[in-house]
Amino acid sequence: MFKKFKPVTPGTRQLVLPAFDELTTRGELRGTKSKRSLRPNKKLSFFKKSSGGRDNLGHISCRHRGGGAKQLYRVVDFKRNKDGITAKVVTVEYDPNRSAYIALLSYEDGEKRYILAPKGIQRGDVVVSGEGSPFKPGCCMTLKSIPLGLSVHNIEMRPSSGGKLVRSAGLAAQVIAKSPGYVTLKMPSGEFRMLNEGCRATIGEVSNADHNLRVDGKAGRRRWMGVRPTVRGTAMNPVDHPHGGGEGRHNGYIPRTPWGKVTKGLKTRDKNKSNKWIVKDRRK
């Protein structure tokens, strides 16, 4: 669910932001009419140290990063290894560190953990991990236990390594086939990939599927998120970029990165990397 704004300023003319209707408010917890957002759990959050896109030597390792509002990092449980212990969804919250929403679970033994919130999960729902869990959104189990055709997310690449695949807003993979020791998944990119049947995955799609419809409306909103401007290479001097300099505009060069490497179409995958787990390429 998204909301548009009246074009009373240039910054609001194109602005489209999420309505956050799925999120739990302070009023819901306290029994009031407050619509204010929740603060994260103190024991599961800490302030991130901003790197400004620099590495340990102070060199820029990632361009166009810096500034922005200070962010609290929420510790999310990607392993989902508390088997057989039911957990109740206490809250569904916003997370500035990812496109999806997160849900705070309270387990029967008193422990609390954040997980990626699947689509449709609500406050008060009950989820559980491990074999024999129900096939409903938020429950986690190994791939060999999941029926064919079911949508999954937060998928491990190796058993017990924690979810690595399909974690962004609105994504889901589909269980396509099973063979001795392996399960074939159709990834959101269209790629068919085989994974060990002992890898865990969570049932359902990732929440906030309309994330791609968001329009920030102005450069300042991107700056609040720590994104700095991108300068075109043709607008630079020759000392700064291979595309720089020249009398007027010219287009007689092969597109290159600021470090002189050919880009736009050049294959970057390591030729020695194994493709035996990829059943079908996403581009075919």
UniProtKB/Swiss-Prot annotation:
Positions in coiled-coil regions: none
Cellular component per GO, a single term: large ribosomal subunit
A GO MF term: transferase activity
Residue ranges with Basic and acidic residues bias: 240-250
UniProt keywords, alphabetically: Ribonucleoprotein, Ribosomal protein, RNA-binding, rRNA-binding
Gene3D superfamilies per record: 2.30.30.30, Nucleic acid-binding proteins, Ribosomal protein L2, domain 3
Region feature (Disordered): 232-284
GO biological process, one term: cytoplasmic translation
Function comment: One of the primary rRNA binding proteins. Required for association of the 30S and 50S subunits to form the 70S ribosome, for tRNA binding and peptide bond formation. It has been suggested to have peptidyltransferase activity; this is somewhat controversial. Makes several contacts with the 16S rRNA in the 70S ribosome.
Subunit annotation: Part of the 50S ribosomal subunit. Forms a bridge to the 30S subunit in the 70S ribosome.
Protein name: Large ribosomal subunit protein uL2
Species of origin: Chlamydia pneumoniae
